[in-house]
Amino acid sequence: MGSKMAIVIVALFAMLLFISPEVACRNFKEELGEVVKETNEESDARLAGSSGGDLDKSYCPVHLPLMEYRKWIGNCRCGCCQWTTEPEVCLYCCPESHVPDLPSRPRAY
């Protein structure tokens, strides 16, 4: 019985490793009722770009009522941002319709 439970735990952990941050981001946005639209071309372009030497990350901030708690990444201020680590340049931002136009320069927090 103990070995079966260990196998189940290892299998669940392996499944968590295969879920990408982008999918988690998309599921989070769908739960909020926001429309998430992505074409196969956009998905393929991001996958092709991520095969280079740079590591891709995804950033999902906590949606707080005050805009000051959202972070700037590169030159983008958005709900989800995928960027390279060297240099930190935003590759893709998920648009948010409720975010007003903001200045192009980030503020120091």
Swiss-Prot record:
Swiss-Prot/TrEMBL induction comment: During nodulation in legume roots after Rhizobium infection.
Disulfide bonds: none
Keywords noted in UniProt: Membrane, Nodulation, Signal
Any one Gene Ontology BP term: nodulation
Any one annotated GO CC term: peribacteroid membrane
Top-rank taxon, per record: Eukaryota
Subcellular location: Symbiosome, Peribacteroid membrane
Stretch forming the signal peptide: 1-25
Protein family (similarity comment): Belongs to the GRP family.
The protein's name in its UniProt record: Nodulin-16
Organism listed in the record: Glycine max
